Amino acid sequence: KKYQIHLQNHYDATSRQVQKKEIKVLKKRKNLLIGEVFPYQICLESTMEYSRFMLWFEKEVQKIVKELWNQHFIIKLTLSQLHFRETILFLEHLKDFSKRITIEFIGEDTPEIKKHFSVQEQEAFFIGKLRMLKKWKFIISKHIEGCSVEQTLAFTPCLHEIKYTMSQQARMEENIIDLHMFIDFWEYWAIHKKLKFVVEVKEADFITKSLMHKKVHVQFENA
């Protein structure tokens, strides 16, 4: 096997309870794990390999959600993966478990074969696919880092959750007041649109405590 599944816990920073388990993929070489694999990278590099990978990934995910029947899971995709039939089939085959799966859409590169579409055409396509996934009862989450505010606002009616992942670099570079203003805007938008807003951090630090004091919903990852 080229790949191996790794489950990463996402905790609520206040209760310290596991909320969800993210289904990650690690790459193996000569039985050594050599780092995380991102499906969209495979998708960009080779459609044949992506097809094989998604068949393998589907079997592994099915096995996990059946075994851990009382858990909620996160699967991270990019919007551009929705252009590929393999992705849609993968999600369609998981419909029976959709209420226990959050699909998190993260930053991305648009495939070369789709770059001739206008921004408006791309947006309309993605909105159609997100509506379909919502109809299938998946929980739809959109990361707001690395994408335009306009895009997130346009997709809002199709979402259950908006999420901001705070990297170590961002913490060092951001002015703490600017950061709080940024968080305040998205928290207001989420309340106004009846969405959940989550700030994800790598570990508990002073910024996490500051956000928790404001009663922002904070999650942190742990291996």
Stretches with model-predicted labels:
Residues 1-97, 188:
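Bacterial c-di-GMP phosphodiesterase EAL domain
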Residues 95-174, 184-223:
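The catalytic core of metal-dependent phosphodiesterases that act on cyclic dinucleotides
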Residues 44, 176-180:
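Short, conserved loop/turn and helix-capping segments at secondary-structure boundaries
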Residues 56, 179-183:
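Conserved acetyl-CoA-binding loop-helix of GNAT-fold acetyltransferases
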Residues 51-55, 78-86, 110-113, 170-175, ...:
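Acidic-and-aromatic substrate-binding clefts and catalytic sites of carbohydrate-active enzymes
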